Amino acid sequence: MQGSPQPSGEGIPLRLEITRGSFHFRGTVSLPVLPTRPRELVPLALALADAAAEDAGRRVAAEGSAVSCKKGCAACCRYLVHVSESEAYYLYELVERLPEPRRGQVRERFAEARRRLQQAGFLEALQQFPTWTGREIHERGQAYHALQIPCPFLEDESCSIYADRPVACREYLVTSPPQYCATADRMAIRGVSLPVSFFVGLARFGVPAEAKTLHRWVPLVLALEWAESHPDRTAARSASQLLNEFIEHLGMRFPTEKPSPPATGGCEERNA
């Protein structure tokens, strides 16, 4: 596949080629000129995730099926969506750039989601997400789904930041009827497996080699408050160094047969 995913802003053009399993990308990307941080790779990861999803859609069609995800189908927008730390900063900056009154409306929806979590007695458990084991990720994902809290970016059952939605949202594809996603029926949901996860590419940044967890992630519903309370103190490096590390992360994926609702993001643990 050929294409030209472009991170926002001007930079140095670079030819990029990625091959992982059945996915092959060859195109031109634009890297920042000055030293930068992993969060600056988010636009590139979003574009690459789109390319991988399109490739998967063609593969599914060739097999006589079709991806059933479409506008207005928002069942997965009530899942516990995982975003990388880089994406949490990206979403925070995105909301801060929104004009009023829209910025206030989005922030109020985040506040309402937080109130509902607190009323349900689930907020404290959710705030402990960095310590969760793989089993807890699944169990608490189920508990979160039962609350049916819509994503704060959801408006009229459609994503209001569709062009900037998280990588995990782009990588969650199914061929089964929407009602199975609504009930989070793992036995009935037919997920589309992807040969590469760009969520992992972002979420591996900052993970020590000896760490138990494979990824650093944040619940989307807590992304804004997390970004506010965790200033990005990552040391700036050359964009080419960051890109090389990002590409290396893509080879660290632990493939699964299908997505694992209702926790969307692909986080696993070494010793769950």
Question: What is the predicted role of each segment?
Answer:
Residues 1-272:
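Short loop/turn segments that flank or connect secondary-structure elements
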